[in-house]
């Protein structure tokens, strides 16, 4: 396993005391798995006080099919004129790979593939094939804005296949149109943060940590003591502000009101429920997604061509 994947201090620095946009069940799996690696003996839900237990990790699904052209020059498949961009696993700020890699996808890779597809003459539209519980806040909003920017160049659709939660929902909201499968899990428009406290464990081992610092907030949220009330309030305010920013983005992209988005209270929706909540547009079988998008693009092209022909005919008649 590479150093990048086993750099536990780096992983911990991104997982703790940082806002995350994760589907709740996946968050439990994630932190329970990470706890075993970091020697954390107990995980507690700060809201309910319950201990967290791990469930089953999500399984990635992806569309498959023949590429319209040679793949070596592209970082995505082109199927019937549609660039298919897989977005699976945990979403992180950046990775070394453009494609999903070792259970995660980098926002930097999504942006790079979007920009390449937007300028590809063989691509008429872009489909984000998504199976993600969400991930890091860092980079998510910028990535969503790029999706919204690219959709003004070429249609960008999102397919929840079979999960599209939290940060994934943010990205999907920025798309021109959102498809969901009948069992797809979507929504979870909220933010969370975890704080770790190693103080008791270190004391049992006879280890005492002394923090020497300058600046009253320099060691806020440090993992060697309980979280003080005032620091927790500050972190809670940060979560609330990020959640509101999340809701504002979804509102701007989808046309839903900010209050309607906030009123979801980070609920997770399944299939048709997402359409009823205004977070998705159409229920499809994942194997039909390419055909559905292709038919829509052809119909749009036909309408535009018909409109141009009508104007040209009128112009000729007037002349």
For the regions a protein language model found, what residue spans apply to each?
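N-terminal organellar transit peptides
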Residues: 1-319
């Amino acid at each position: 396993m590479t150093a990048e994947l086993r750099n536990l201090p780096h992983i911990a620095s991104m997982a703790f005391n940082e806002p995350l946009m994760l589907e709740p069940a996946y968050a439990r799996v994630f932190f329970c798995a990470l706890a075993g690696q970091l020697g954390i003996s107990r995980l507690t839900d700060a809201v309910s006080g319950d201990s967290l237990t791990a469930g089953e990790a999500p399984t990635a699904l992806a569309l498959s099919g023949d590429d319209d052209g040679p793949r070596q020059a592209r970082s995505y498949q082109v199927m019937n004129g549609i660039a298919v961009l897989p977005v699976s696993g945990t979403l992180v700020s950046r990775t070394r790979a453009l494609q999903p890699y070792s259970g995660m996808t980098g926002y930097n890779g999504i942006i790079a593939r979007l920009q390449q597809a937007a300028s590809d003459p063989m691509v008429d539209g872009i489909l984000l094939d998504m199976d993600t519980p969400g991930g890091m806040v860092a980079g998510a909003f910028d990535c969503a804005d790029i999706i919204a920017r690219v959709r003004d160049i070429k249609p960008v659709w999102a397919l929840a296949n079979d999960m599209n939660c939290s940060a994934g929902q943010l990205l999907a909201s920025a798309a021109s149109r959102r498809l969901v499968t009948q069992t797809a899990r979507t929504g979870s428009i909220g933010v969370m943060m975890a704080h770790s406290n190693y103080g008791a464990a270190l004391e049992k081992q006879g280890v005492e940590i002394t923090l020497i610092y300058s600046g009253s907030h320099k060691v806020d949220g440090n993992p060697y003591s309980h979280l003080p009330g005032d620091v927790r309030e500050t972190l809670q305010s940060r979560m609330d502000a990020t959640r509101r920013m999340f809701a504002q983005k979804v509102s701007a992209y989808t046309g839903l009101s900010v209050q309607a988005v906030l009123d979801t209270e980070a609920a997770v929706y399944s299939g048709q429920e997402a359409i009823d909540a205004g977070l998705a547009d159409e229920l499809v079988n994942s194997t039909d997604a390419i055909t559905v998008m292709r038919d829509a693009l052809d119909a749009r092209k036909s309408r535009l061509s018909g409109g141009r022909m009508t104007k040209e005919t009128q112009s000729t008649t007037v002349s």
